[in-house]
Amino acid sequence: MNALSIVNKVVTLVSYNMHKTRLNAVTACVKSLLNGSAATVTSIGRGINAKAFEKHRIKRADRLLSNPHLVSETPLIYASICQLFCGNTTRPVISIDWSDLDDRKAHFLLRAAISLKGRPVTLYQEVHCNKTKEKPATHKAFLKTLHAMLPSNCRPIIVTDAGYKSPWFRAVRALGWDIIGRIRKPHLYSLDRGDTWQCIRYLYTQATCRPKRFDNSQIVRSNPFACTLVLFKQKSKGRHASNPDGTRKASKRSKAH
């Protein structure tokens, strides 16, 4: 099945209550993006496959993206997507992460995506500014909305990166879900039910490509959080941060010496 057939099928399934004219406009804009158009009003409009003049195609995309009815239907569309991709499984693996939306670092995307055969499919996402980015209240509201959209029998496994800390873990566990995350310094950990605490970096030297499991562990000495720690070091993939011109990034301190 080619991409256009999949788009037609999925869009129809998740927007069955949408007005036909608006549904056709959504499908046309999605196909425009699928054919390589940038995610801007002008580019989407120019990429619409229709006999209308270019200015009318751009106006069509502009009307759709500013349509208040489409905005009000967005939660229902996300809920339908959750039902479509999570309805047949009770333990989906859902990745949640932040990403930048623009080069100015002014807008950020918080996205929940299900992993299907190595491909992420977005279930729900929100756009935030610097004032609400990575705030506990933002995370709790996001989880509450996602919980309401998922099927009632769904108990997902949430996967997050090292940027999320114990308040996030507690919020996920409060919903009855399981979570997999990365712990990095300066977190403190205990392997003996709180009798001895050490910085997590002391475990780094023991890490190998063979996973080690530590049951009945705790993190955060001031407010212990019970968990299972797994120590694992993956083989280096040779990735390096790059500057906009493609050269390898270097710290100011290394340049001074």
Question: Where do the protein language model's features map onto the residues?
Answer:
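Single, function-defining residue in the core of a domain
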Residues: M1-A38, R46, A50, R57, ...
